C-alpha cells in the first residue's frame, strides 16, 4: 500500500521580492540612480516592464529615444552625415509622433563590411562616442583578432549568429551593452513569473555569472 506524502507548504514569493532578488543578483549591471539617463530610467525604472501605464510608458519611450537620437547624432560622424542627408535633426523631434521621423539604418548595413584592418576601421567609424586606442597585432588580422582587440580596449563588439550566411557586427560601449543585457534578462524573468519564478532566477544567475551574456 502506497503511503501518501504530506502536502508541502510552498509559499509563493511576491513579485516585489522576486524583482528585488533579481536586481541584487545583477547589481553590477545597474548604474547608480543619480547617473541615470532617460534610457536608463526607461529600463531600470519600471518594476514590471509589461505593466507600465500607457501614458507613462509612452513618456519613458519618447524621452529615451529622443535622448539616444541626440547622442548618436552628436557623437557618431557616420550617422550625423546620414541624418543630414535625410534633413532630420534632434530639434525636429518635439512630440511622440515625431519618433517616426528619426532616420533608421537598414540592418543589411551591418552585414556589409571589409576584412582585416579595414574591418577595424569600419567598426571605429560606426561607433558612437569616444574611441579608445585599439592595438591590433599582425598584418592580416582575422575577424576574431580585430574583435578581441576592440574588446580589450573597452569596446563590446556584439554579433549575430550568422544564420543568414553573414554575421552582423555592432560595436558598443560597456554601459550600453550592460543595459541591453539587463533588459533581456528582466523581460524573461518577468514573463516567467509566477509559474517558473525559481527556475528562471536560477537560469539568469547562471547566465550572468557564467558569462554567457558576455558573448554578444
Question: Residue locations for each model-derived region?
Answer:
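Nucleotide 5′-phosphate-binding alpha/beta core
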Residues: 2-159, 166-203, 209-216
